[in-house]
Amino acid sequence: MARDTNGITPELRRQAIDRLFAERCSCVIRNGSDMRVFYERGVKDLYRLLKEEPGLLRGAFVADKVVGKAAAALLALGGDEEVSADVISRPALDLLEKNAVGTGYRLCVPHIVNRTHTGRCPLETRCDGLQTPEECLAQVTDFIETMKREG
């Protein structure tokens, strides 16, 4: 994970990771000199960025607390260069590796659990068996649209 791409040095990576925990945010995205902090739960921020600001993800370094397969798909589709996760699921790690996204993590788990810790993350379940980021994106889109309708 020590590549120096897009002007993102190891020191800048460390700053993004430190900020992730200091600010108690969901993710920090570093792209060149631009560093932005996000607070939405789940994949909402990554999904919005992919749809509305894809340039921020392209070639970026992303520090994220939890990366499941759905988040990994969004990062791969966005052209993310590298991700550092506190916790990553094995399916997410496999998908990122298949899509040449550099990956570092503290803990790799079989799957991501839901917010109430009573089962699996619903998006992790929806992405089971899917092979491509595009297939996962369709599930993420459906999930987000369903959540909006149900309010």
Located regions from the model:
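Conserved mixed alpha/beta catalytic, RNA-binding, or beta-rich assembly cores of soluble enzyme
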Residues: G7-D86, C108, V113-P122, R126
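C-terminal binding/interaction regions
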Residues: G78-E81, P91-G151
